[in-house]
């Protein structure tokens, strides 16, 4: 239980803004940390859903509401995944050999490629939320659990690059099996929750998550020879923009079909 409690505190101190007393990052203390990362996603999804309920009474402009929707996940997670996203974008944009890309991942400075992509990312996510149908919000709220569960599962199951520090997250024997079982359970819960909310929204949302995961696999193994923590963080940000993107594109296509029939 002591190790579980230590992992819980580390998960919330590293992956959220919620206060948790800092403890030493050792392999023993981090053995179960991935179990609690999707719980942060559940809190983000819940708060986002509550924002959907109260925002019409607080603001009149959809744009401001969309900006808040885009910023809430970043704010509540403490920007935990953005750093890895920046570094991976920098490495991919360099078009250098694998060894140089891995070196860029270790660089703590952000290049102009990362800054440009970041600005484009936030413009796109704000635009998506500003046009998102209200009935899609409950489904997308589950997406914050799904993205983090896939993040955890990949760290446990995928081969790591030689430069990766992900081994700190990976236990051995029984503890590793427990973490994998929890990740699979989170994935099942989020998928079932999406389908129960609205199957017509859930399917494109899951397609978006699948596309992001396949792209993640391609980037990790083709460009870097395995995953690193930064590349896994890159996946979370890509997944959380692909899900609303595919949902919105599907909604637009459906409206165009209906308009064409009329």
Where are these regions (language model features)?
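C-terminal ends of transmembrane helices
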Residues: 20-24, 80, 100, 104, ...
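Interfacial loop-to-transmembrane junctions
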Residues: 29, 218-242
